[in-house]
Design a protein with these regions (language model features):
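PLP-dependent enzyme catalytic core of the Aspartate aminotransferase-like
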Residues: 335-372
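Active-site phosphate-binding strand-loop segment of PLP-dependent enzymes
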Residues: 117-173, 186
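Conserved N-terminal alpha-helix of the aminotransferase class I/II PLP-enzyme fold
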Residues: 21-71, 75, 90, 94-100
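Conserved active-site segment immediately N-terminal to the catalytic lysine
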Residues: 180-192
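PLP-dependent aminotransferase-like
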Residues: 67, 75-131
């Protein structure tokens, strides 16, 4: 049976060659595997536009992207530290929840889900928090698809002398990030988003100068970021069992990113996908949740039709039966569904999805009148 097309923010559609890369076994302590890990770490820094010579390190961490986030939060904020989270969606809220569970002094600053953190308010907030040592934000908040202004926020945070943590799960590899210019201290991401690979681990790009200050700070053994980096530096290996097959797939996915033309070329494909989706859905009468200037090309939230007969479950299963998978909404105050435009998909795939949505609409007379 043919796999469906995944219009999701990840895990997502991967190429046949990325999947094929997992069809072999490799020893986790083998010299070839250690060489593979070293090449992956170097390539991640290259994608971010930095290098070890510029004082940056790439640390691979077993587990999902959230494991990488928890690794950073639990490892780099000292016992006397204070953590400020700028949140406008579920994933910002998750960072604060992690910190609070760990007993870290935390301030959660909330914005509406359809608004980005306002730099002026962030400036005031940091001035109100002289004890704050670390500030964090989600770059692309996949609750809505909003792209937060990390350039402006980074300038404010660094000018105040605080360390800056960026959750770039859904943006790294698909949205250019100038790590060196912005002086971001920690960027966390995962393979199964814009890098178009499979899940199984996360990675952290860190400024070495700040990472070196975190020895013995971790609140976890398995998620100790400094110890993980130290182990990779000492013998090139994970401290615990690495996801060997996922790393083989990732190495191939990184090659394919380079072959495509790098982050700018991939971003252009995602932009074209998003434009095809936006145009097609607008023609069907669907309203986007976000204003265009705040919308990323990663995932888009659409409001439910103004029709009491609309049932997302019916809509979802109709599309799934025809080979398309979309996401339900995750908003706290609005009924939406979400459609991703990343992964190994193109404009024609998006048009095919929109055509299927149009056919569904025509099957529902009241739905058609409400949307078209």
């Amino acid at each position: 049976m043919k796999d469906p097309l995944l219009f999701t923010p990840g895990p997502l559609i991967t190429s046949a060659t990325v999947k094929a890369a997992m069809q072999r076994d490799i020893g986790s302590r083998d010299a070839d595997f250690i060489e593979l890990l070293a090449s992956i770490r170097s390539e991640l820094l290259r994608i971010a536009g930095v290098s070890r010579d510029q004082g940056y390190e790439a640390v691979l961490m077993q587990g999902s992207g959230t494991f990488g986030l928890e690794s950073v939060i639990s490892s780099v904020i000292p016992p006397e530290g204070r953590f400020v989270v700028l949140a406008n969606g579920a994933y910002g809220e998750r960072m604060a929840a992690i910190a609070e569970r760990l007993g870290i002094s935390t301030r959660l600053a909330r914005w509406p889900e359809n608004e980005s953190p306002d730099p002026a308010r962030v400036q005031h907030l940091i001035e109100e928090e002289p004890a704050a040592t670390h500030v964090a934000i989600v770059h692309c908040e996949t609750t809505t698809g909003i792209l937060n202004p990390i350039d402006e926020i980074a300038h404010i945070v660094k000018a105040a002398g605080r360390e800056f943590i960026v959750d770039a799960m859904s943006s790294f590899g698909g949205v250019p990030i100038d790590l060196n210019k912005l002086e971001i201290d920690y960027v966390i991401s995962s393979p199964n988003k814009c890098l178009e690979s499979v899940p199984g681990f996360s990675f952290v790009l860190a400024r070495r100068a700040v990472l070196e200050t975190t020895k013995d700070c971790a609140r976890s053994v398995s998620l100790d970021l400094f110890a993980q980096w130290e182990g990779l530096e000492r013998n090139g290996q994970f401290r615990f069992t690495p996801p060997t097959h996922a790393l083989l797939a990732f190495a191939r996915a990184l090659e394919e990113l380079r072959e495509e033309g790098g982050v700018s070329a991939r971003a252009a494909r995602y932009r074209a996908n998003h434009e095809a989706l936006r145009t097609g859905m607008n023609e069907l009468g669907f309203a986007e949740y976000l204003p265009g200037e705040r919308q990323s090309n990663i995932i888009t939230a659409f409001r439910y039709p103004d029709d009491p007969n609309f049932r997302f479950e019916d809509f979802y299963h109709y599309l799934r039966a025809r080979g398309f998978v979309i996401y339900p909404g995750k908003l706290s105050r609005a009924h939406c569904f979400r459609i991703g435009t990343i992964g190994r998909i193109n404009e024609q795939d998006v048009r095919d999805l929109v055509a299927a949505i149009g056919r569904y609409a025509r099957l529902k007379p009241s739905y058609v009148s409400a949307t078209i």
